[in-house]
Amino acid sequence: GPHDGTSLFSQACDNLTGAGKIFVVSAGNNGTNNVHVKKSFTATDTLLKTVVNFSTSFPQKKTWLDIWGDPSQIFKIKLSLYNVITLISETRFFTLNSTSIDTFIVGNANDTCYFKMSLIPSDYNLKPHVLIDVYSKTNRNLCLTVKANAGTVHAWTGYVSNSTGIYGSFSTTGVVGATAGNTD
């Protein structure tokens, strides 16, 4: 969910515990990883770029990108592959339209990065939401670009395999104008 108490799970916990009680959840043991990135957009500052780093403790390059915006605000996303600082390949910008997309981009060595995207606004909090399932078979840097004219977007990276949390990070590695992640 959007990590702000408005997800269906958060609402269920509120309803189950009642006044004067708390519900405690462990959110993972990734406090030193920059798993979150945030951007507040304006009419003159419309792009967030960040490099997606995969966990080195997992044999495959897999992650989920969980992206949330402000209610009634629209944003678009694009994914790109970079060879250090050179753009190799990219998708078009995708807009929220209540659909799922299964696509890929090919690097310059015929290696492939696969994406499954769900671009569906949440019925529970009216926030735009994109969930991307990434499986990369390339050694190129993966860059997430978010485009908007207003509002704030938050993104988190993480993956679960056999009940174990796998955490990479967001960074600026090699991409001009990229934003590093944080531990929020």
What does each model-found stretch correspond to?
Residues 1-184:
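Loop-rich non-cytosolic ectodomains and luminal regions
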